[in-house]
Each structure stands twice: as C-alpha cells, then as structure tokens.
Amino acid sequence: MQPRRLAQPAAADVPAYAIEITPAWTNRMKANAMAKGEVVWRWGEEELVMLPQRALWRPAGRQLLVADLHLGKAELFHAHGIPLPSDGDQASFDRLINLCDRLNPEEVIVLGDLIHGRLGLTPALHQRLRSLPEACGCAISLIGGNHDRGSDLEGLPHQPSQRLGALWLSHEPEPQPSSPLLNICGHVHPVARLRQGSDGLRLPCFAFHASDQQLLIPAFGELTGGHECGQRYRKWLVADNAIVPWLDPLSHSPSRRLAR
C-alpha cells in the first residue's frame, strides 16, 4: 500500500529538481513518525524530519538542527530591572538533552542565537555551555547569530554560513533561488496565527518559501516570541507535541500560487 500523500503545490510553484513534499517512506518509517508526531519531508535526496520539540533531524549525517535558544534572556532582562521567568533555560537544556538521548546524533548544529546577549552570559550559564557537548554526547557547532556577537563561548567558536549536502545552513535568511540548495535558517522565529471569530492563537511553525528555496525553523528557546509568516509560506504547526501540516485556505487553494 502506498503511503498517504499530503496535498502538494502545483509543479509551477516549486523548483522542478528540488522539492518533494512527502517522501516515499516505508510503512515502518511512516508509522514511527506518525506515532511520535513528526513529519518526514524531502528536498531532492535530502530527507529531513520535523520534530515537535521545534528541531530538525537530518538522518543521513545524524545531525540535529536547532536555532534561537536565546539562553540567558531572563538574566539579561533582570540586569535591566525587568522581571522574567527564569526557568526557560532549564527547559531548553532538558529538551535538547532528551532529544540527543533519543536520537543519538553525531552533531548538534545551532543555527545562531545560542545566547541572548553578553549580559545574560552568567558564570552558571558559561558552565552549562562548557558541559553541553558531554551532556548531549556529541559535538556542538554554532553558526553565529546576531545575538551571539561579542560573546566568548569556550569551545564554541562562531562559524559562518555553510553548505551541508544539498542544504545551505545560516542564521539569518539567505535565499537560494538560483541554486539547487535549500536554505535552512533561524532568526525569524516563525509562527502562524489561527483565527476563529474574535479568538486567535499563535503557534510556532516550520515555514517553507518555495521561490526563495528556504525553510525557516521555529525558535527552540522558551522566551522567544515570534514573527507571523505570511500567506506565501507553507506551514507545519507545532501543537500538542505534534507537527501538524496546515494549509492556509487563502494561500494554498488550487487557484493560488504557493510562492512569489
């Protein structure tokens, strides 16, 4: 039996060589992903798994991609006399370590903004970051983000945007419309707004822009806010510990193009 396929955009909306929204996975892979609330997605030969923990898994190289942890944000605000809940960092650390325990990655790649700023980089946070590779059981790489600038993170030098297989990894969006690469980035903190009458709900999401060949991944941190993605993006919501493919009826009807 062939696996059920999600609705796909018209062929004219996507690069012909690049995108397959739902891969032909085996029944076992499909069942495992569905049981865990995950979505398996393809870009050419690259298989990617969207995780409800707001992370992206690349099985081929066993890389776990996260972005925008903004560690130390509460402490930075406290330094300016603004109270914020201070347990967000612990929740982010716990979620990351639990993911590593389950997936056993070869590498965790942080797509920028590991910390929120130098003032929030306390001695305790310094120590947590020094011990993070051991806690995760793998190497940690950091593509430097705007909030990481000027910080001295021992063992975590800032790396530039870089290629990984058919992927272009960056912190800020770096569209790849004239290449076969998919830009995976953070920085935006993508969210989707759901409306029902006068009620509204904002949920973190993965967001794909076809003509920019770009996949935005949600902020991994707890105190991060979000930027609402427009109708040109195809979205996968993070809700109730599951990834939920969502089609905006205004932007994904058969008569409307997915992207610019």
Regions found by a protein language model. Give the residues of each.
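Short linear segments in intrinsically disordered or otherwise low-structure-confidence regions
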Residues: Q2-A7, A11
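Extended recognition/assembly regions associated with phosphoester-bond processing machinery
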Residues: P3-R4, I19-L111, H116-R260
